[in-house]
């Protein structure tokens, strides 16, 4: 294991030059202190967990000190926000400190969010508040634990620095880890500014460092797009299967790696509602839960447009047609597993559709339903769950078909339970739980957020004594809409 001073930087993106990013020094927070850290994320850098207890830890991740081999830079990009093109966005409050290479030879971007003003801050102050930093930390690590690809979060550093949003709040910084911070919007920026030479340079860079298997392909740029499309389809399938609503699927928030990126007003479904909108600012429901699939397709079309100088339009269009079948196959496989099926049958998609329709009509808790379905043999489980539904006739018909389908699977009931518990979490990050932990942290009590993080890092385990985190939300805690302000 390494100490903080032993981290090895090799800053490949910085070497692309000033056309792609601008060198900026972080602006330190006042009186920094550690709020919460992830040992699992620290392990990605081979960091000794004891390093989090050192004063240097908070100093490095609050802008007070910086590694001599780090090269903090703000990246430039653009993007479509709520369907409209914004010509220049860029890192307005975050800095790519550099790329750390671990013992396995893996590269990890260290990105300090809330590090102060940059040339791309526009009217913003470059800061992040404690509230949004905790939310991103919890979600990043929880999604990873659920098996949903995501950027990672090393730590949150709090401070005495005041930041003004709807009200005065405490400033904070989040240290985000990801193999790459390149977004769809990076390519859009160079396409729409007609910098096609730089666009090609960026494409060659990301293929060389992130998709080296494509280097020998006769059409690497086309295969890059296809790979991004495949990864995005798989990601969205996992979002939909586990009830995750991102809330701000702008193209500048879409990763080329197919990982969940840039957390804002996200939410997991409480009661199942396909039309759920988690973003208070999303008046039209563009980024509602049920729209995430078509929006991902739309965003991929925006990326495809940016690649037209190097890939034929016909080829891009044909590739776009792969998205929905890939998504549907991945989603159906996940949902089968959530229902306890290890084999495929032709009627499975319709069985799942009927279930979701019944859940929608009765406002059934999405996470608890699947967990409880695996607690007992199928016939006993559906009898227990029946009381959650309003349309009893419809549910009874579905339950009969489900039990018959389960019987055709055969197998040991104990093995079925283990199989289902491995894919159906007991614990999910509900917004009201995050809010309670945030309110305690804002008063200086970090124990609740640390405990919540620990529980959510093992979402499939029973964890005796932590059952309160698996309870149904109170009425006030359901369907919370979160502001974009952060």
Swiss-Prot record:
What is the enzyme's class at the highest EC level?
transferase
Task: Write out the residues that bind ATP.
Answer: 90, 92-93, 113, 125-126, 176, 183, 262
Q: ATP-binding among the record's keywords?
A: yes
Report which reactions are catalysed by this protein: L-seryl-[protein] + ATP = 3-O-(5'-adenylyl)-L-seryl-[protein] + diphosphate; L-threonyl-[protein] + ATP = 3-O-(5'-adenylyl)-L-threonyl-[protein] + diphosphate; L-tyrosyl-[protein] + ATP = O-(5'-adenylyl)-L-tyrosyl-[protein] + diphosphate; L-histidyl-[protein] + UTP = N(tele)-(5'-uridylyl)-L-histidyl-[protein] + diphosphate
In this protein, the active site sits at 252
InterPro entries in the cross-refs: SelO
Q: Which GO terms describe its molecular function?
A: AMPylase activity; ATP binding; magnesium ion binding
| Function summary | Nucleotidyltransferase involved in the post-translational modification of proteins. It can catalyze the addition of adenosine monophosphate (AMP) or uridine monophosphate (UMP) to a protein, resulting in modifications known as AMPylation and UMPylation.
Q: What is this protein called?
A: Protein nucleotidyltransferase YdiU
Which source organism does the UniProt entry give?
A: Stutzerimonas stutzeri (strain A1501)
Q: What lineage is this protein's organism placed in?
A: Bacteria, Pseudomonadati, Pseudomonadota, Gammaproteobacteria, Pseudomonadales
